[in-house]
Amino acid sequence: MDFECEFNLHCYGERLCLIQVFDGQEYYVIDPFSVSKSELKKTLESDVVKLFYSAGSDRKLVFSQYGIRINALFDIADLVDVIDLRKKGLNSVIEEMLSIRIKKKKKYQKYNWTRRPIAEDAIQYALSDVRYLFDLKDALLKRIRENDLMDTLACRLDKPEFDYEKRNAPGVKKKSRYKKYNQQKKKIFDVIFRIRERYAKEIDKPPNTVFANEQLFQLVEKNREIEDICFGKPVPTEVRKRIINELSDMHRM
């Protein structure tokens, strides 16, 4: 099983956009936009084992969006960690373990999965992420047995329950530039960040489209005047004025 999701690339926030399923014989795609929450919950919280690859972000997304905790999930990435492959991306692992080279089309790496209908070739691209999961699991387990690493695997799988409540800091706050700020500058940054988030949600656009992260830093460092903010094209004039007024009021405080 695998998901295609929207992560603040084409619209605001994170959204589950497509579910890809392969049962070993047949392929299925589920449109979460057309399925009730109760049906999604019944499917994802069932006792049927679900093979994923590196499922952490997917688990958090369906929990934050639907309150669903994926049950009976087996993450193949745990097997990769046990044998310590140098490259851990799915395609690299498939090439290493199955000698199958997958050429991914770059145009789908930023595909807008919120659009309907989804193009047929995009669906085929999405299904390629589940095509080899059964074979990959078998090949990894075989190598683990051959290298006498079953005890290591048991220790790896005996880990704390997945923390659905843990929230990661926004990417922009992980930058060294932010970390070097004193408390006062961090406070100013956080206020401007929240203002941008609120308007991004209002117009349903990624925050970086409202105005770029670089400008956020420049405002904090006073290297850019509020009136000189360069807004993204999708931001309506009326919203631009409100943002400038709100930031100006904050600046005068």
Predicted features by range, described:
Residues 69-71, 100-108, 201-209, 239:
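Short, surface-exposed acidic
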Residues 56, 130-137, 189, 193:
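Hydrophobic faces of stable alpha-helices that mediate helix-helix packing
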Residues 90-103, 229:
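A polyampholytic, Gly/Pro-enriched intrinsically disordered region
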Residues 77, 105-114, 210-216, 243:
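Short linear loop/turn motifs
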Residues 1-92:
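Conserved RNase H-like, two-metal-ion catalytic cores of nucleic-acid enzymes
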Residues 103-163:
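Acidic, Mg2+-coordinating catalytic module of metal-dependent nucleases/exonucleases
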Residues 144-253:
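Acidic catalytic cores of enzymes that act on phosphate-bearing nucleotides/polynucleotides
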